[in-house]
Amino acid sequence: EAAGPTTDDSDCGAEENICIGLVTDTGKVDDKSFNQAAWEGTQLAAEQVGGFAKYIETVDPKDYANNIGQFAAAKYDTIVTVGFLMGEATIEAANEYPDIDFIGVDQFQGEAVPNLAGLVFREDHAGYAAGYLAGLMTQTNKIGTALGTDTVPPVKLFGEGFKAGAIAANPEAEVTLVYHEPNNAFGDPEWGAAESRKQLDQGADVIFAAGGATGNGGLIEIAKDPGAGTTVFCIGVDIDQYFTVPQAAPCLLTSAEKKLVLGTETLVMASVAGEMEGGNFVGPTGLAPYHDTDSVVPDDVKAAVEEVLAGLADGSIDTGCPACLDN
């Protein structure tokens, strides 16, 4: 007799119950970005296996360990933690609770812990493809960025990859990389908007705004420009921001995507099936559809970008990363 779906976490320790917990990084679970995508993937997996899924929103980084510990104490089977900054707390918890599977989204594992899988992405690949598109679309040869902090490797990989791709497509292009200072790097839409506005005023006509709410502020600002979608464009990040930040639609060329929903869902499913392995799991990356700007992107540009995506996938194109993290 198959047990019915698990509907709460009062008895997660029981063999027939499946409980999956997710701890967000600082920010809300509906952040229209990272936390939200990981939570959607977790929910999809829970639905398929008849499991119970619950999240805890982290308010302050000092609460990481405590939040993870709440799920562990309730004997959850699988705990997903979101974001590079939770890496250490996740490793400590995995060592303390060897019978629980941990999935660290954006947490590269230096040495493998058997019950901890790091879901990592080649951000430099998605960034490079987006940059290549920007290099072919710019009319002013000035390309801008408004990024989270480069103290978080995935953000730096996006930025450096973007710059490398833009210059590969257009050696004349001038690419400005601007990172937010580490404090509140992903929660500062005002900075994202002001930085994007400044670069538009300096002649940039394609801007990559990447970094949670900070980047979203940039996208929304660029979309207000009278030239949005004709002479001025923006590029989003992580997930297809056409759907998460609809205000950006007028300027949005594409988004440099990490397939977070799919990656999280795949690993949670593997965990529940008892097939998850410790170490790193490389999730898929790509570019989101052109949507409203589809008609202004020439066919030869689309074809060139497809070729670049194929070259990144088969390894024939080198982005210069991850070595770029050292410069």
Residue ranges: model-predicted function:
Residues 1-327:
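A residue-level marker of the well-folded mature domains of exported/periplasmic proteins
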